[in-house]
From Swiss-Prot:
Record has Amino-acid biosynthesis as a keyword: no
Major enzyme class: hydrolase
Residues involved in Zn(2+) binding: 71, 107, 110
Lineage: Eukaryota, Metazoa, Chordata, Craniata, Vertebrata
Cited SUPFAM superfamilies: Cytidine deaminase-like
Domain CMP/dCMP-type deaminase: 20-145
Family annotation (Pfam families): MafB19-deam (PF14437)
UniProt family annotation: Belongs to the cytidine and deoxycytidylate deaminase family. ADAT2 subfamily.
Entry protein name: tRNA-specific adenosine deaminase 2
Species of origin: Homo sapiens (Human)
Catalytic activity: adenosine(34) in tRNA + H2O + H(+) = inosine(34) in tRNA + NH4(+)
Record-level GO BP terms: tRNA wobble adenosine to inosine editing
């Protein structure tokens, strides 16, 4: 397992996490990613942790819901909003002190949502070289974007190899929900 040094507090001073906390929460995020894989979803899992409590967690639900926006981070954001309603907490106060642990770099859509919610810190596993919003494709996390929330700190590479292996496993299998025109053609094998 790859271990990274404990993150420094975010620029706003809103939060910091230890190496032990990072390991604990990333283990649970990996479990969520495995659950996604078992349900024929892209294996991405995440947790949103506020005051050392999981207030939202998610895994990709795109195939299950047939809704392309149901990425792990968006599912978790919805859970945090529900938790805030039930707890009588201000969502802005909670998000500004929440750390996101996610197995894969958030895509551009999710990075924009995290920025709008003013999440100060994102710890992620592997890069998302096709859709990454934290530097791999665009850097939504730290770009100078007026009126779009607050930039956030990223700590990449935590258990990246494990996250990549799960993605490879997913992309080797058939997607039963794919349109017929998109299904990979299997090569005929000669005897």
């Amino acid at each position: 397992m790859e271990a990274k040094a404990a993150p420094k507090p975010a620029a706003s001073g809103a939060c910091s996490v230890s190496a032990e906390e990072t390991e604990k929460w990333m283990e649970e995020a990996m479990h969520m990613a495995k659950e996604a894989l078992e349900n024929t979803e892209v294996p991405v899992g995440c947790l949103m942790v506020y005051n050392n409590e999981v207030v939202g967690k998610g895994r990709n639900e795109v195939n299950q819901t047939k809704n392309a926006t149901r990425h792990a981070e968006m599912v978790a954001i919805d859970q945090v909003l529900d938790w805030c309603r039930q707890s009588g907490k201000s969502p802005s106060e909670v998000f500004e002190h929440t750390v996101l642990y996610v197995t894969v770099e958030p895509c551009i859509m999710c990075a924009a949502a995290l920025r709008l919610m003013k999440i100060p810190l994102v710890v992620y596993g592997c890069q998302n070289e096709r859709f990454g919003g934290c530097g791999s494709v665009l850097n939504i996390a730290s770009a100078d974007l007026p009126n779009t929330g607050r930039p956030f700190q990223c700590i990449p590479g935590y258990r990246a190899e494990e996250a990549v292996e799960m993605l490879k496993t997913f992309y080797k299998q058939e997607n039963p929900n794919a349109p017929k025109s998109k299904v990979r053609k299997k090569e005929c094998q000669k005897s």
